[in-house]
Each structure stands twice: as structure tokens, then as C-alpha cells.
């Protein structure tokens, strides 16, 4: 038996097989916890952790890849480390509840959280991240709109929603920074976007 025996058992949620392998001297490594987390096999994750299986940043990161909120919670609440990739992967895959949980429990994030959420049409993740202080500077917003969203404009209602959301927020920021109000007609904005892709 090798380390693969344990992570294959965890990957498929075979708790009794995992227990048997471990109790009979089969080695395991961080991948046992990772595969349990990404596939939502909480009992396998608990057993592995409680019996000394190592875990690390990738355990939380991989839990968010498939929206495995309970595995993410268990890992974090039991001392598993995380980093900004946890938020990035949650946003990239549209797992809003994982993104909220990570952020509200102090997980860091950066511009990639907004960029990947927008690139993949996850408007709720874009809104949540932006409205909760995720850094997304104007140059990144411009890049998102010009290089990612406008080419998708015809094919995706969500892309339109994200562009409109960014433009509304950008207008609000400009008003606050310049001390004057300037409201753009969104129909005019939509016509401009449509003319760029015709």
C-alpha cells in the first residue's frame, strides 16, 4: 500500500477503507486531506486530520474549488491555514458562500478575486468582493471590461450585468473623487458596447 491508497479512499469518500489502510500502516500525506476536501467528504477529512494526517493551504483552496463549504469550515476552524488563493478559487468558480465565509473569517484576497469572478460571469461574487473592500483598481476594471467582458457581450447577460455594475460603481467613485455628480445614461453605455462588437 502507498500514499495513493489513502488519498484514493478519501477522494471517493470510502471512510472504512481509509481507516483500514491507516490502521494497517499505509502512509498518507497532504493529498489525503486535499482529495477529501475537494470532493466534500467531510468524515474522511475529519478522520484524516484527527489521526495526524498533514494538511496545508491547498486543503482550504481545493475545498473552495468545488464549493465544499462544510469542508472549508471544518479545515479552517481546526487550524488549517489558507491564503488569498482560497478567495480567488471561490470567486473563480462562483462559490459565493465559500467566498463570504473565507473573507468574513479573515482570509486575504487581491485583485485576482474580482478579475476571475468577472471573467467567469459570477456577478454575485464580483459584487460581494467589490462591496466588501476587495482591491480592484481602475486599471483592472478597465482591463476586465475591455479585454474580457466586451468580447462576451453578445453571448452573456451576466457579462452585461457585470459591465453595468462596474460602470455604475466607477461613476460613483468619480463623483466622490471629483466632488460633482455625473450620471451616464446606461442605454447610451449599452449602445456603445454593442457598437464595439458589431
Show which residues each predicted segment covers.
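Ankyrin repeat (ANK) tandem alpha-helical domains that serve as protein-protein interaction scaffolds
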Residues: 1-198
Amino acid at each position: 500500500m502507498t500514499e495513493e491508497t489513502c488519498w484514493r479512499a478519501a477522494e471517493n469518500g470510502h471512510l472504512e477503507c481509509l481507516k483500514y489502510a491507516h490502521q494497517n500502516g499505509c502512509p498518507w500525506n497532504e493529498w489525503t486531506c486535499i482529495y477529501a476536501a475537494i470532493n466534500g467528504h467531510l468524515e474522511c477529512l475529519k478522520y484524516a486530520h484527527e489521526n495526524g494526517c498533514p494538511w496545508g493551504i491547498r486543503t482550504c483552496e481545493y475545498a473552495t474549488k468545488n464549493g465544499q463549504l462544510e469542508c472549508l469550515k471544518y479545515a479552517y476552524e481546526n487550524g488549517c491555514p489558507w491564503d488569498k488563493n482560497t478567495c480567488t478559487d471561490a470567486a473563480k468558480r462562483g462559490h459565493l458562500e465559500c467566498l463570504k465565509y473565507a473573507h468574513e473569517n479573515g482570509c486575504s484576497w487581491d485583485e485576482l478575486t474580482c478579475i476571475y469572478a468577472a471573467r467567469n460571469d459570477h456577478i454575485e461574487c464580483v459584487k460581494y468582493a467589490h462591496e466588501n473592500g476587495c482591491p480592484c483598481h481602475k486599471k483592472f476594471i478597465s482591463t476586465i471590461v475591455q479585454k474580457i467582458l466586451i468580447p462576451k457581450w453578445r453571448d452573456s447577460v451576466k457579462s452585461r450585468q457585470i459591465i453595468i455594475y462596474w460602470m455604475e460603481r466607477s461613476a460613483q467613485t468619480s463623483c466622490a473623487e471629483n466632488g460633482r455628480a455625473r450620471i451616464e445614461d446606461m442605454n447610451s453605455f449599452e449602445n456603445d458596447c454593442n457598437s464595439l462588437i458589431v
